[in-house]
Amino acid sequence: MASEGDKLMGGRFVGSTDPIMQMLSTSISTEQRLSEVDIQASIAYAKALEKAGILTKTELEKILSGLEKISEELSKGVIVVTQSDEDIQTANERRLKELIGDIAGKLHTGRSRNEQVVTDLKLFMKNSLSIISTHLLQLIKTLVERAAIEIDVILPGYTHLQKAQPIRWSQFLLSHAVALTRDSERLGEVKKRINVLPLGSGALAGNPLDIDREMLRSELEFASISLNSMDAISERDFVVEFLSVATLLLIHLSKMAEDLIIYSTSEFGFLTLSDAFSTGSSLMPQKKNPDSLELIRSKAGRVFGRLASILMVLKGLPSTYNKDLQEDKEAVIDVVDTLTAVLQVATGVISTLQISKENMEKALTPEMLATDLALYLVRKGMPFRQAHTASGKAVHLAETKGIAINNLTLEDLKSISPLFSSDVSQVFNFVNSVEQYTALGGTAKSSVTTQIEQLRELMKKQKEQA
């Protein structure tokens, strides 16, 4: 254990920290992922100190050499974390002192861990969100391109898990793609809030050494500089926003996963998952379980839990930095890892599943065309509410007779309304049914094709911003 004098806050305290307190306080196991970005921030700050006249050129070169050595050790995985390292910032400073001696202590001149930890977190999130955005756009592309290939496949659409109207399989795929484009847009908005530099804010009052914050911004490639030092070191709006966007994204993926789980059951038989994304049973040899989709579905709860915990941490804090904020890094890193894995698995599932066009078509039933029967009467001049009632009577008559609605005779239909004529037979055609929904957003082939074209264009724009 390091002596009290070696600790960052050494000098004020007598005796050693209680071991249980040390264990509770440490966050090093979580924060090792921030090691490299902490080095980046320290390199930028060292250059700013030299410009401000705090470091000589020789001292700067020595510090930069030490930081680069630590970066090299990190890349090789040989950096050693000690029991006394409370967090990654402490570990890097301790290692720098081991490499270059007491001159390492100059690096922290005018800099507080309060600003250091939030700068590191923002740098980590900037990098991570770019990767997440790339994976998300790949998933959207996979959905869109599959929709283009399988555009002629028709299956039942459901409301309340009851057969409702026939739709194109592509319409189903695109419904999820469109939702995910909104998530992609929201990730872009979060990036804007992350891209504000807090470094140079000190503990809360600012930096007293005439540090060039514009130089820091440029070195670390932030878009702008924080306006108020007290706000900069304590605000975690960007964390809440990211976790909120991640939660909504996982809810969308959970819905898609649930749909696909249902469609993959033997009761539906609409699709089969690849063996690469399925597992078996330890007891029942015949089982092929959609574990990939079930895990995607479960992760929504995990991510929402992270959001809820951070909101509860923040709701009771006074201004500026408090140790409670240590919880933010574990939440962010866990959600970054979860999203990165889930998006890749979802893309793998969508790209490899096999659909059964035959089973989808078998599931189409004439009763699903009852709305079309009402629309037939509307086109004959009947008000929709009356047409709806007439179609309902036709459904009831067919049920009474124990036959499908398309097997009602013309006389049966005329007994309901004289507007029925021989051309009513054209209503009972599933291709004709989907093709009438030509308005933008509908399930007609022309509309689905337009959706695909617009989504491809939107993806190009979002890729440029990723």
From Swiss-Prot:
Keyword Phosphoprotein: no
Record-linked Gene3D superfamilies: Fumarase/aspartase (C-terminal domain), Fumarase/aspartase (Central domain), Fumarase/aspartase (N-terminal domain)
One record GO biological process: arginine biosynthetic process via ornithine
Keywords: Eye lens protein
Taxonomy, superkingdom: Eukaryota
UniProt key word NAD: no
Pfam families, per the entry: ASL_C2, Lyase_1
SUPFAM superfamilies found in the cross-reference section: L-aspartase-like
Gene Ontology molecular function: catalytic activity; structural constituent of eye lens
Tissue: Eye lens.
Subunit relationships: Homotetramer.
Function of the protein: Delta crystallin, the principal crystallin in embryonic lens, is found only in birds and reptiles. Despite possessing the necessary catalytic residues, this protein does not function as an enzymatically active argininosuccinate lyase.
Entries under NCBIfam families matching the protein: argH
Protein name, as recorded: Delta-1 crystallin
Organism: Anas platyrhynchos (Mallard)
